[in-house]
């Protein structure tokens, strides 16, 4: 799942990425990051790129590509742009957006819209079983309940949150609520086992509890990610059984002793 942004090369960027992934045999779900930061013309072009690619992916029968309607974050997207994205979103896909990654995102939403971020997304029709929210650091229990009610997905990006000094999300509570949660990177690393390790120690440190995260982190990586992908691809993923997709990686194992 890639949330791409390159504001000097919007048109056809998702198609270029998908072709490279195809050459490598990698299954991909792509979207372009819509934002008002570079003006309305660029925002509109971003919406159109998402729509074009999503329709192309929906018509493809290889089960190797999928598309979403990508958005940057609440504080960089006006109601006008939200409405434009919703009007051009094909049926059968959802949104991919950063949510409450920084406290500024929450403050902006409260000041300009008089509501918290998840409430705004709910009112704009963004939430749902096909929508993926990144981060969710500054959300409260009421917002978690909305995510559960709408069956919206969440992805935790521990190294990105630490590197950007954003804070630690209430991921253990989110998982406890039964919200489908995956483990990601936000582009900070390409090593998922490193993300696994960092997520494990981050929540132990943050909660001052050495028993925290032992079950939740492997659940996110080995079960949550496959279930998230399963909402966009037809074949069974994340399992070793007859008929399932053979999405297998083989890693070197360095023995601790000679």
Model-derived regions, located:
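Glycine-enriched alpha-helix->loop->beta-strand junction motifs that scaffold or abut catalytic
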Residues: 25-27, 88-94, 126-129, 146-155, ...
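A conserved active-site cap/scaffold subdomain adjacent to cofactor or substrate pockets
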Residues: 140-142, 146-184
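Alpha-helical segments flanking ligand/cofactor-binding loops in enzyme cores
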Residues: 19, 83, 119, 144-145, ...
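Divalent metal-coordination and catalytic microenvironments
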Residues: 21, 69, 98, 133, ...
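His/Asp/Glu-enriched, well-ordered alpha-helical/loop segment
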Residues: 123-126, 130, 172-255
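Metal-coordinating catalytic core of metallo-dependent amide/deamination hydrolases
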Residues: 7-137
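Hydrophobic alpha-helical hairpins/lids featuring a short glycine-rich hinge
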Residues: 1-7
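Short, acidic/turn-prone active-site loops that include or flank metal/cofactor-
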Residues: 34-35, 101, 158-163, 186-188
């Amino acid at each position: 799942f890639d949330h791409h942004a390159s504001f000097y090369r919007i048109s056809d960027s998702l198609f270029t990425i998908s072709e490279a992934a195809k050459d490598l045999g990698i299954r991909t779900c792509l979207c372009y990051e819509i934002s008002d930061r570079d003006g309305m013309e660029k925002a509109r072009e971003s919406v159109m790129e998402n729509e074009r690619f999503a329709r192309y992916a929906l018509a493809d029968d290889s089960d190797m590509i999928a598309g979403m309607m990508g958005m940057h974050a609440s504080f960089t997207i006006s109601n006008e742009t939200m409405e434009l994205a919703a009007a051009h979103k094909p049926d059968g896909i959802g949104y991919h957006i950063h949510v409450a990654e920084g406290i500024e995102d929450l403050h902006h939403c409260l000041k300009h819209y008089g509501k918290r971020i998840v409430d705004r997304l709910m009112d704009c029709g963004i939430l749902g079983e096909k929508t993926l929210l990144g981060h969710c650091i500054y959300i409260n229990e009421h917002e978690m309940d909305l995510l559960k009610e709408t069956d919206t997905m969440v992805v935790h990006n521990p190294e990105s949150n630490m590197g950007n000094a954003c804070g630690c999300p209430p991921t253990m509570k989110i998982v406890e609520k039964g919200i489908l949660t995956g483990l990601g990177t936000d582009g900070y690393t390409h090593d998922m086992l490193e993300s696994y390790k960092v997520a494990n120690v981050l929540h132990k440190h943050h909660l001052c509890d050495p028993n925290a995260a032992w079950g939740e982190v492997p659940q996110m990586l080995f079960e949550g990610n496959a279930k998230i992908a399963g909402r966009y691809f037809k074949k069974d993923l994340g399992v070793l059984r007859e008929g399932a997709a053979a999405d297998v990686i083989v890693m070197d194992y360095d023995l601790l002793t000679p």
